Amino acid sequence: KAQGWTTVMMRNVPHSYTCDKLIGLLESKGFSKWFDFVYVPINFTHMLGVGYAFVNLTSQERAEEFILAFDGFEGWDSSFSKEACTMHWSVCQGLDENISRYRNSPLMCEEVPAFYKPVLLKDGVRIEFPKPTKQLRTLRRRKGKQEEGEGEE
């Protein structure tokens, strides 16, 4: 990993999890105010999570501690999954890169409910996502495929 990496990918997140539910879990485990970006990609055909999430921590040191705390985590509040979480560095790194990746995504269209969109926080309090810098395309629903703007693998 490169120095200064702060964004992690959590795998084996239960399909029932949304950003709100994941934020609640992270806060309950003592990580309140440690993160400033959370996104749980959703399959809009089934209206369920796709099994992973992205979290940006406020420093590399916090990211490394977060990885240690959640790698192998099995305490999900869900009947959907009892798989252990595995932690990875995200391809997209840092708050600015995550904002750039999603601010002009079809995911940010008005018709997409807010609870399916990425969340930004400052000192543990939600803040508004920056406005798009260009015209947003409508989110396309494609059979058998994930929706655009869902994340990376």
Regions from the PLM with identified roles:
Residues 4, 34-36, 81-85, 111-117, ...:
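Generic structural motif recognizing short loop/turn segments at the entrances and edges of beta-strands
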Residues 46-48, 74-76, 93, 121-127:
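Low-complexity, flexible helical/coil segments
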Residues 18, 53, 94-98:
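Alpha-helical structural motif
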Residues 1-50, 58-83:
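Canonical RRM/RBD RNA-binding surface and closely related RRM-like beta-sheet modules
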Residues 103-153:
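Non-catalytic, charged low-complexity extensions flanking SF2 helicase motor domains
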Residues 74-103:
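Low-complexity RS/RG/RGG-rich segments used by eukaryotic RNA-binding proteins and nuclear co-regulators
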